[in-house]
């Protein structure tokens, strides 16, 4: 009898437990993908999304501080594209991403969405600049077991290889279209689920 009560109590706790909070810090890619992210996460997670059009990594530090004050279980950072697009110092962008990560010492996992190296600006290729940020993200991943990479660049690259010349996941080489948003949201959900 006591064992049955414990099983029932455990089941009730499991059903009524709050969803783990996930802090999202992002730019316009996160703005346009927010509905798909919320759909993909369902009731498994409680997303706290702070995303601003055109924002660079360093400009999100105040929002990161506010998110950190809520002590989220996991963090998703999708920033750096505007640093690449607007010609910002990549050294500063990397330092700003480190500052954002440092705000979350208690997060179980920090998921960094890397940058699409196929972005262009008025026809000018931005791959080398985006690649520099992606290499820095890989180094962060190697240095901190909590950090992983949501490989948006690989998703876009594979799609472009299958559907040349520009692929089917973005309309402007930067922002994901509905198909791209769905794939990005699923990749984020997979990363959250794999946090161990």
Predicted feature residues:
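N-terminal export and membrane-targeting signals
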Residues: 1-3, 21
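C-terminal region of N-terminal signal peptides and the immediate post-cleavage residues
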Residues: 8-22
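Hydrophobic/aromatic beta-strand patches that form the interior of the parallel beta-sheet core
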Residues: 23-25, 111, 148-150
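Conserved beta-strand termini and adjacent loop/short-helix elements that scaffold enzyme active sites
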Residues: 50-52, 113, 150-155
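Alpha/beta-hydrolase-fold catalytic nucleophile elbow
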Residues: 78, 113-114
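A short helix->loop->beta-strand "cap" motif at the edges of active sites that frequently abuts
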Residues: 106-110
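Catalytic His-Asp segment of secreted/periplasmic serine-dependent ester chemistry enzymes
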Residues: 118-196
């Amino acid at each position: 009898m006591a064992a049955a009560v414990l099983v029932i109590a455990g089941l009730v706790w499991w059903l009524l437990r709050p969803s783990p909070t996930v802090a999202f810090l992002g730019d316009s890619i996160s703005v346009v993908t927010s509905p798909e992210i919320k759909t993909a996460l369902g009731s498994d997670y409680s997303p706290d999304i702070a995303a601003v059009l055109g924002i660079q990594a360093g400009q999100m530090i105040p929002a990161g501080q506010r998110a950190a004050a809520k002590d989220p279980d996991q963090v998703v950072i999708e920033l750096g594209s505007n640093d690449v697009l607007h010609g910002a110092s990549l050294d500063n962008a990397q330092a700003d991403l480190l500052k954002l990560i440092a705000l979350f010492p208690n997060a179980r996992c920090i998921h960094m969405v890397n940058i699409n190296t196929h972005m262009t600006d008025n026809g000018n290729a931005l791959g080398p600049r985006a690649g520099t940020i992606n290499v820095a993200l890989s180094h962060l991943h190697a240095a901190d077991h909590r950090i992983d990479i949501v490989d948006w660049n690989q998703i876009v690259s594979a799609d472009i290889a299958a559907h040349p010349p520009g692929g089917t996941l973005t309309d402007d080489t930067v922002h994901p279209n509905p198909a791209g948003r769905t794939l990005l949201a699923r990749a984020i959900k997979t990363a959250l689920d794999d946090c161990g």
